[in-house]
Amino acid sequence: MIPRVTSTAQTDLTEGADPYGICAADDGALWVTLVHSGAVVRLSADGGRRDYPIGAQARPSVVTVGRDGTAWFTRTGDDRITALDRTGAMTTFELASGSGPFGICVGADGAVWFTESTGDRLGRIDPDATVSYVALPEGCFPAFVAAGADGAVWATLNHADAVVRILPSADPEVIDIPTPGAAPVGITWGGDAVWFVEIATGRIGRIGDDRLVTEFALPDPACRPHAITAGPDGCWFTEWATDRVGHIGRDGTVEEYDLPSSVSEPHGITVAPDGAVWVAAESGSVVRLG
């Protein structure tokens, strides 16, 4: 069954380019990063808004939310990870200079995982605040990271045209993508498999338990899919270059939806507890598809 989008609602956050990452919390709130002005915004389910400025130099990028409601986000500009709890208190972890943290997720055990895109490492922050690292192939440029159902985490290796699977007790398992120049970016666990986007070739990829990669070509190979997230009946993804949102079913069926004409450069995407799809558009707004 393909979900049907019957309406869109746009909420303007900034006058200029800004919204980038977005994540829905269990309480219905949305967390949004403003990558250029340097802030994180919480939009509550009742329409309230609270801004947490951290400085334009921080370039907050991707955000995730833990089971306790704490929002974690990467600061690509100043090489930090920050946790923002329900009270508004911030805890910041300083990383190696020039490491370029980008993707972030919460694992099944509550640990926080993040990518260091220019450091070629995956980092892990344990609940006791211990930080450890997993080295990845040199020059691979890890991008997004997602938690699987078996305790593993998966990350896209943008410059290596590959996906890596990590278990805390095992060596990294690198899985090559068949299409050269795929440049994978977004990745998510889709309930039965790992799904990822190939921004340079306009494809969606799937990796099952057998580690086989299946690729699905999108109608426009130049649409530049960027982020992807799981929903009840498949996955939703953004098409950065065409100002659209797409849905792919588990059988590979693709449906695409145009965003409002005033919206451009969709990046982050999330599915809220009520099933609504939310998109962060760098043009200055978040958009709800329902």
Swiss-Prot record:
Domain of life: Bacteria
Protein name according to UniProt: Virginiamycin B lyase
Protein residues bound to Mg(2+): E265, E282
Similarity comment: family membership: Belongs to the Vgb family.
Record-annotated active site: H267
Cited Pfam families: Vgb_lyase
Keyword Lyase: yes
Gene name of this polypeptide: vgb
Protein's job: Inactivates the type B streptogramin antibiotics by linearizing the lactone ring at the ester linkage, generating a free phenylglycine carboxylate and converting the threonyl moiety into 2-amino-butenoic acid.
The entry's keywords: Antibiotic resistance, Lyase, Magnesium, Metal-binding
Any GO BP annotation: response to antibiotic
MF GO annotations: carbon-oxygen lyase activity; magnesium ion binding
Gene3D superfamilies: YVTN repeat-like/Quinoprotein amine dehydrogenase (2.130.10.10)
Needed co-factor(s): Mg(2+)
Binding residues annotated for substrate, in chain numbering: H226
EC assignment: 4.2.99.-
Quaternary state and interactors: Monomer.
KW Cytoplasm (keyword) present: no
Species classification: Bacteria, Bacillati, Actinomycetota, Actinomycetes, Mycobacteriales
